[in-house]
């Protein structure tokens, strides 16, 4: 009988799940690839114990990605929630998005995003991606942009391009400033 290290079985399972996700995140950061064997070794569990929580490495990677995207959403929300001016909110969103990249946290999202996920999990990740961009859509609508979805995708493209530049080693401050200037110029043209 396995030892339960929490007040209830549900809490024990949640703690184990968190430990497995944390181990998978660490393995992914170190090697870019997650295997059940590597996660089992990292946690000190048997591979069969890992499979009690996750059917496959893809399911585990999906939880890593979902947790990291949720953290990114929280980071962005904290950056924009108290800003009333939609233009300044857009600037804060771009700045916060790229600070997340510059401090290295986005590398985990990129690595996990390259994995082949089960369709249900892929849909969950796509929903979270839409949540990431929700503040942009809201700000654009408040600015009177009638085709906010299209313009938001352009803003996302600018941020994605700056992300690749930062990850390639270009100075983050320069990329943030350029991305903000370019995005705002585009928004101004769309008004």
Tell where the protein language model's regions lie, with residue ranges.
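Amphipathic, non-transmembrane alpha-helical scaffold segments
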Residues: 13, 17, 61-65, 69, ...
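Generic hydrophobic, amphipathic alpha-helix propensity
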Residues: 15-24, 39, 64-68, 72, ...
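Amphipathic alpha-helical packing segments from all-alpha helical-bundle domains
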Residues: 70-73, 118-153
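Basic, helix-initiating cap at the start of DNA-binding domains
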Residues: 1-30, 36-42, 59
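Short secondary-structure transition hinges
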Residues: 59, 98-134, 164, 168
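Hydrophobic alpha-helical connector segments
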Residues: 63, 77-103, 155
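Hydrophobic alpha-helical segments that form the core
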Residues: 95-99, 146-168, 172-186
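Short hydrophobic/aromatic patch on the recognition helix
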Residues: 43-54
